């Protein structure tokens, strides 16, 4: 069987690249996978967005017909993560407990409460504006302004709760990395020459990989996130943009995930996302479209923490001096935005091949890279299986 395995290079070591590798290595077909990336789990760089994510399952996709495929990806990921935490899929001791699985994977079930300050598509009566209300477990409309056991944000006009899955993202990335290497993936830490466009990048990736493995390359998966702008056509590159985020990591794990939107300007959002098993929680945040600033905005930092205090979003974490949060770190990251949504498809030029190998793109997932990861990766597997 090994002799018939098709060799796939995956360019990119973030959530999309790692999950694509895992999906290829666990599908019914035989694939040989090489992960080629500048950064892998454990690295710290603003160019490496995945470890900087807040990390919980909450679909950002609306009801438009054009987003049906992304809705399916998100639903598939929720299903897979639930099975993983329930011990129904994945590698692990058959006697391991839920707590063991949380520690190993970095995933964990948490109740999530979402609040809105303005009416919109998502605040339709009975939750009809949220396509995923029948996908998640425990979905319930909250009666505002009073709820059973907590006071909602002062300006909230609509709220829900459901069983979400929160992510200790550094641990989850390490888990995926260990799984794909256990299953036989090779990893090469190197940067590809992007000075000659797509042809040059594919050619250089092949050169790097074939230097230590002479087996022929069947396909390359471009899972480079925002870095794809350096190798795709000018027209395609113009569709890619950063969505800057800034978050604060604080001590303690919040009891639940909380989100509050539409309470201020278009850029400000408030969320609290515990990182299961880490003893820490992410507090955010913002969505600053087109902002490439790397430095921490101290004013925004203060606003993030003040909003969390004012709206009572994480009272159990106010264990610092004067009832404040105990800050561990502050981080800035660029979500990989793309006009038109994620691009998961075979290359449109040259009949789908570049320098003699099939090229499949998988980038542009914006702030939905984690919740779409399994479904998106399985779409890549489907594309490759049809070649």
What are these regions (language model features)?
Residues 16, 41, 227:
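Conserved Rossmann-like nucleotide-cofactor binding loop
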Residues 19, 48, 198-303, 315-320:
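Flavin-dependent oxidoreductases
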Residues 65-80, 159-175, 295-300, 373:
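Short beta-strand to alpha-helix junction loop
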Residues 2-16:
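Beta1/beta-strand and adjacent pyrophosphate-binding region of the FAD-binding site
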Residues 53-151:
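Dinucleotide-binding Rossmann-like beta1-alpha1 core, especially the glycine-rich loop
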